[in-house]
Each structure stands twice: as structure tokens, then as C-alpha cells.
Curated annotation (Swiss-Prot):
This is Arginine biosynthesis bifunctional protein ArgJ. The lineage of its organism: Bacteria, Bacillati, Bacillota, Bacilli, Bacillales. It is found in: Cytoplasm. Keywords: Acyltransferase, Amino-acid biosynthesis, Arginine biosynthesis, Autocatalytic cleavage, Cytoplasm, Multifunctional enzyme, Transferase. Belongs to the ArgJ family. Substrate binds at T163, K189, T200, E286, N408, T413. PANTHER family: ARGININE BIOSYNTHESIS BIFUNCTIONAL PROTEIN ARGJ, ARGININE BIOSYNTHESIS BIFUNCTIONAL PROTEIN ARGJ, MITOCHONDRIAL.
Length: 413
């Protein structure tokens, strides 16, 4: 598919129409059905034609799944270098002990043999039901098709990583570094068990930029803190979530670092990709009908701004009110109050869809019909001004609908 670019005046980069994980030079991606799911794609891969500087961040859940343990160890041994990633859905390979780790390493070996690269340059990821062993005969079948061009489409990869998601999530942007075109692509999955500090969420980012692994890791950690770690669907944190980035140096320019004159341009583009994917995950929450954005400003610290934003968007009462299109701002105030952060009610100002509802801690009369009309929109915004400092943060989530219970009551069946 021919890619088209659209440039917004507020960005120093272009959003590539139909852009994807394999839009950056030197990357291919694919996916196929190997029988882990009844009739949907369930096995995917990314391959770079050259060795890529790589970095990853992982779940904070102490029951870290086998593929994450193996990938983390692999990146340490390879000193942040990868050339391929393989991922399966429908089976998390979590709580599977030493066999789970052995199976993840065997998967690495099979992929490495097919691509004729060292196994320490292969990352592995899984998502799905916890507590079941991988059916390795099916996994092997998948690895044997990695070089088959019939399955080598980014769309197939996007589908292969899904579980309860209702749609694929992907993007690519381009920018100029030293006068040369650099591209950043991304793909993600996530719908349920999404909570700050990442959960049942996988995100993969590729770029043809020239950047070293340690710089890439610092950038990824910083970006994740205010993007992927600022989303919540249901407050659960999974064993398998990971964000992984590969930069294969195929565009030859001065190595990117904080000293590069166009470093901030690259950072802005990278953060945009992460934010886009994070919001797409929040919007696709299980049973969700609305995306919720909570903008907190005037906090004494970034940590307070983030915590208050996440507390509001995690509140089941707030989420239920948004689903019911009910302007029950008392639930927002309650969440702010129990967040554990420093606040002063007399300085607190709240807007719901840009309509003031609280000023200096007091309720504000508003047009109920106008408010009701705005709450029918698919994107609901909550703005909180604390009046205590200059720190700000944004959290993303979704409403809580009847379908959330229906979906999760029958997840294994």
C-alpha cells in the first residue's frame, strides 16, 4: 500500500496515512493462524534486515511471565541488540515455571535458525490466558513460516497480537534528521487488564533512525512514564505487558543523543507515537463506549499530577457515570480527595467537557441539557486545576459498561 503523509502545523513531523510497524526502512512484519485461537491470527513477528539498537520496559507485576524474563535476559546478554521479535496471542506462557522459560528459549532458537541469526538477537512476547503451557508443536509451525512472504504483511502482525481487542492499533510518522527522512512506526494491543505501570498491554515501536541502545532506553522509559503508564481500563495489572523498541540505523545521520540539535524533534515524534498507541488502547477498553482524558494542572509535583489523574480515571464510579452520561462531578471530587496527594479544596477548579462544574471547591450551576449533549460524545475530557504549583499530567481511560462484565465473565470459554 502506498503511504501518504499529512503534516500538522503544530508538529515537526508528518503522520503517515496507513503507516505501520514495518513502514521504517529495513523492517518487515507478518502474522498467521497456527491454532492457538479458534479462527483468528495468533502468531506474529517483526524482522529487521540489520541489527537494531533495542530497549524494553516491562510490567511491575511480580509474577513476570516467562517471555519477559527471557527477553530481559536476552537484551542484557546482547547489550541491547535485536534483529527479530516473535509474539503469540491466546496463551500468556505465565505461571508456567521453568518449562515456560525453556519454551520461550526454544522459540527463540527456532526463529534464529529460520532467520540465520543468533538466538540472543531474538525477543519473545506472549499474551492471553495465564497458567497454560505453550503448545510447542504449533509454535514451531509458526516459526517455520517466518520467511514466507505470503504472511509478511503488517496488518497480519497487528491482528496476530490481539486478544479481546476490537480493533488493531498502529501508526507511523516521519521527520527530518540532518536533512534525511527518518520514520517511526508502532503497533500495540490492549483492551482489558490495563492499568498504570502497564498491563496486558504489548506495544512495539520501530525506527530506522541511528540511535544507541542506552539512549533509546532512557527515551523509552521517559516516554512510557507519561504515556503507557498513564492509561487504565479496569485497574488490573498483568504479568505480560511490555513495550519494546528497535532502531536499525538504516538512515545514516549523526547519532541521535541529547546533544544532537534535532533531538527534541525526534523525542516529540517518538512521544506522539507512544501517546497515540496509549490512547488507542484506552479507547478500546473491554466494552468501552467512550475515551476519557483527565488533564491535571497546577499540582505541586509531577508525581501528584499523575497520581490524581490516574485516581480519577481509575474510579469505577467516575467511569460508570461517564457511561451513563451523568454529570456526577461529585465522584470526580471524591477521587481527587482520596488520591493521597496534597490539595486545597479552596483552590480546586474542575471542568467536564470544558463546562465548569467546580470552582474553588464549590459546585457551579451549569446547563444540564448542554452538559448532557456533550456527554454523548465518544471522547470525554475532565480538566482539574489544583492551583498549588506548575506541574501537569494527563491520564487516559474509558467508561465502564455492562459489556465489560459479559466479556470477562466468559474469557476462558
Amino acid at each position: 500500500m502506498k503511504h501518504q503523509e499529512t503534516t500538522s502545523q503544530q508538529y515537526n513531523f508528518s503522520i503517515i496515512k496507513h503507516g505501520d510497524i514495518s513502514t521504517p526502512q529495513g523492517f518487515t512484519a507478518g502474522g498467521m493462524h497456527i491454532g492457538l485461537r479458534a479462527n483468528k491470527k495468533d502468531f506474529g513477528w517483526i524482522y529487521s534486515s540489520s541489527l537494531a539498537s533495542s530497549a524494553a520496559v516491562y510490567t511491575l507485576n511480580q509474577f513476570k511471565a516467562a517471555p519477559l524474563i527471557v527477553t530481559e535476559d536476552t537484551l542484557q546478554k546482547s547489550k541491547g541488540k535485536l534483529q527479530a521479535l516473535v509474539v503469540n496471542s491466546a496463551n500468556a506462557n505465565s505461571c508456567t515455571g521453568q518449562q515456560g522459560i525453556d519454551d520461550a528459549r526454544q522459540t527463540q532458537t527456532w526463529v534464529a535458525q529460520q532467520l540465520q541469526i543468533p538466538s540472543e538477537h531474538v525477543a519473545v512476547a506472549s499474551t492471553g490466558v495465564i497458567g497454560e503451557y505453550l503448545p510447542m508443536d504449533k509454535i514451531k509451525t509458526g516459526t517455520e513460516h517466518i520467511k514466507d512472504t505470503n504472511f509478511a504483511t503488517p496488518g497480519a502482525f497487528n491482528e496476530a497480537i490481539l486478544t479481546t481487542d476490537t480493533c488493531t492499533k498502529h501508526i507511523a510518522v516521519s521527520l527530518k534528521i540532518d536533512g534525511k527522512t527518518v520514520t517511526i512506526g508502532g503497533s500495540a494491543k490492549g483492551s482489558g487488564m490495563i492499568h498504570p505501570n502497564m498491563a496486558t498491554m504489548l506495544a512495539f515501536i520501530t525506527t530506522d533512525a541511528s540511535i544507541e541502545s542506552n539512549t533509546l532506553h532512557q527515551l523509552l522509559k521517559s516516554s512510557t512514564d507519561h504515556t503507557f503508564n498513564m492509561i487504565t481500563v479496569d485497574g488490573d495489572t498483568s504479568t505480560n505487558d511490555m513495550v519494546l523498541v528497535m532502531a536499525n540505523h538504516q538512515v545514516e545521520h549523526q547519532i541521535l543523543s541529547q546533544d544532537h540539535p534535532q533531538w527534541e524533534t525526534f523525542v516529540d515524534a517518538f512521544n506522539f507515537v507512544c501517546t497515540f498507541l496509549a490512547k488507542a488502547i484506552a479507547r478500546d477498553g473491554e466494552g468501552a463506549t467512550k475515551l476519557i482524558s483527565v488533564n491535571v494542572s497546577g499540582a505541586k509535583s509531577i508525581s501528584d499530577a499523575r497520581k490524581i489523574g490516574k485516581t480519577i480515571v481509575s474510579s469505577n464510579l467516575v467511569k460508570s457515570a461517564i457511561f451513563g452520561e451523568d454529570a456526577n462531578f461529585g465522584r470526580i471530587i471524591t477521587a481527587i480527595g482520596y488520591s493521597g496527594c496534597e490539595i486545597d479544596p479552596k483552590c480546586t477548579y474542575v471542568q467536564l467537557n470544558q463546562i465548569p462544574v467546580v470552582d474553588k471547591g464549590m459546585a457551579v450551576l451549569f446547563d444540564e441539557q448542554a452538559m448532557s449533549n456533550t456527554l454523548t460524545h465518544e471522547h470525554v475530557t475532565i480538566d482539574v486545576q489544583l492551583g498549588l504549583g506548575n506541574a501537569a499530567a494527563t491520564a487516559y481511560g474509558c467508561d465502564l459498561s455492562y459489556d465489560y462484565v459479559r466479556i470477562n465473565a466468559s474469557y476462558r470459554t
